[in-house]
Amino acid sequence: DFQGVMAGLPQQKDALICDTGGGSTELILVRNGRIGGRISLPFGAMSLTDRFLREGERSGNAEQVKAALHKTWDGVPFLKEAAGLSLVGLGGSAVALPAIDRILFEHETVAFSPHGYVIKRNHMDAIVHALVTRTPAERTDELGVEQGRADTILGGILPGYTLMERFTLPQTVVCTAGLREGILAVLQREGIAAAFSDLRAFLKKYETLAATPQ
């Protein structure tokens, strides 16, 4: 993730990366373009949803999740150094945020690229409130959230959102570059993949060679 973010958002030399998947969340502190701390935690969009955020009492359950996450963040020493930095959000839930932001604040649904999209803290407050107060069906109908993500998106964004709360992070910058782009960046930097136009072509050729009898 670190290499992918540095390749996709090279201006983010000082930031806190938050990649929330289905069952895990990875945090990476970036200072002066280098890793200042990292940790992988065993909860994500699906696990938080299954445990706390299924239908019924969404608001109260969301507050329980937020309280638990704040306590977790207090146990990660390097996070104190992230105070005031931008949060770089990765993962499907983070990538869905710009579309919600545009619907809530610009009333637009036209196609656009979410990569590099900046969401200020007050907009994140409004997005979380909009999700908490809607059912999965309403999130799809009113906020444009994909049907397959509507039930888990709140669990997917609460880790990043509570980091913004706890450490006064002013904004979230959405990044669509992740592991694959990071691998490609390393390969290109080392000159290994110079003959290939992208990582997919590189991997496809590698798989073909590996399957060829020697």
Spans of model-derived segments:
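A short, small-residue-rich loop immediately preceding and capping a beta-strand
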Residues: L16-C18
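Helical "lid/coupling" subdomains associated with nucleotide-phosphate turnover
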Residues: D1-D14, L29-Q214
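Short glycine/serine/threonine-rich phosphate/pyrophosphate-binding segments
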Residues: D1-F2, T20-E26
